[in-house]
Amino acid sequence: MTMLDTTSTVAVSLYALLSTAYKSMQAVYSLPTDVSLASHGLGGFDELPSVDVIVPSFNEDPRTLSECLASIAGQEYGGRLQVYLVDDGSENREALRLVHEAFARDPRFNILLLPQNVGKRKAQDRCDQRSAGDMVLNVDSDTILASDVIRKLVPKNARVAVGRMGQLTGPQPKRQLADPFDDMEYWLACNEERSQQARFGCVMFCSGSCVMYRLVSASLLDQYDAQYFRKQRFGEIDIHLSHAEGSFRTEYRPSAHAATVVPNKLGPYLGQQLRWARSTFRTTLLGAPLPNLNRFLMLDVVGQNLGPLLLDHSVLTGLAQLALTGTAPWLAALMIVAMTIDRCSVVALRARQLRFLGFSLHTFINIFLLLPLKAYALCTLSNIAWLSSLLCWQLESTSTADARTTECSDMRTASKLSPPPSCQANDV
């Protein structure tokens, strides 16, 4: 065995050990739990809670935005519903005008037009300041909700310490060859990771596509807006860090389905994956020092950061061995193939869907595209080039009652706030 072959085999063996421990704990904690909402001792609502839906939008495709808003308007929910669409300085606003006007006729819809792009956080906060509902549902403008999402996400009791997220799926119908892979990726992220994390009341990544919080927890958006990593502000660091700071739990509801649009070209797809990779590293690194993090969540933090690096190292040394010696690292390659087949078989059995056997083909995308991308993401965690240069604003608006459309103006620089502590989860 050459040094490169040994190094590659050791790296992939460590990855296999870490992955086995992680997946085993996932299997254990995916079992039904006896913990119920009633155990927290708070009574029920006297009536259905009111829900405010916040939809930030920037340069969205008019058809996609229309489908998103139509899915919200068609929700099967008997309580009061108010929708706040905030256009974050879109450059295609003229193309979106017909969509804005069509939904502005619905008294439940409020359309806010920001004169300049201020970033997703600030756009959300503009609506949060106006929100008065019991619950706040954040929905991305490229997401289409099932008709019963709000009904399933709204808690059936008045417990304040709960946030909930639904299950994401790929586009329906599948338009691109890669769409089935995207759909399976969403299923794995929701049902392998978030469902187990929810057992401890601390979902580590709450996608903005479909997440609901109590209004009292939405007051933590000031801390969310001021989260720092390496003394810099980042727009995509997850809200759960500030949400959990106030001892609020976050749960996962797999029956609440939301379909989201996925990139249909390689460039946008890699850009999305790069943003997600940076977000994963930043958020898990912020969560790593927590003293009360239980064993599973600590392993989750370690696995999210260390696992891809070990696999990266194994692949790079294997390629170097092939280039320098002309021999292939067969042992490392066989271990990767065996782990892939085993994982996909277990998932197919658990999901009762044979399509997950075909997810083995995604390994090539993962190894040759996503792993180098994750390594690059780790080396560029401080990169903020994609964020808007306008970070803060002051609420100043004029309203037109007929169209229920608000033009927002006046900008200012917000004072810097200290970074908040991170999430603490209790062991079960």
UniProtKB/Swiss-Prot annotation:
General function of this protein: Involved in the synthesis of Nod factor, a sulfated N-acyl-beta-1,4-tetrasaccharide of N-acetylglucosamine which initiates a series of events in the host plant species leading eventually to nodulation.
Matching InterPro entries: Glyco_trans_2-like, Nucleotide-diphossugar_trans
Keyword Transmembrane annotated: no
EC assignment: 2.4.1.-
Gene this chain is encoded by: nodC
Membrane topology: Peripheral membrane protein
UniProt main location, coarse: membrane
GO terms of biological process kind: extracellular matrix assembly; hyaluronan biosynthetic process
Catalytic EC class: transferase
Full protein name: N-acetylglucosaminyltransferase
Pfam families reported for this sequence: Glycos_transf_2
PANTHER family: HYALURONAN SYNTHASE, MANNURONAN SYNTHASE
Organism from which the protein derives: Rhizobium leguminosarum bv. phaseoli
Keyword Cell membrane: yes
Gene Ontology CC annotation, any one: plasma membrane
GO molecular function: hyaluronan synthase activity
Keywords tagged on the record: Cell membrane, Glycosyltransferase, Membrane, Nodulation, Plasmid, Transferase
Domain of life: Bacteria
Family statement drawn from the similarity comment of this UniProt entry: Belongs to the NodC/HAS family.
Coiled-coil intervals, chain numbering: none
Intracellular or extracellular location(s): Cell membrane
TM ranges: none
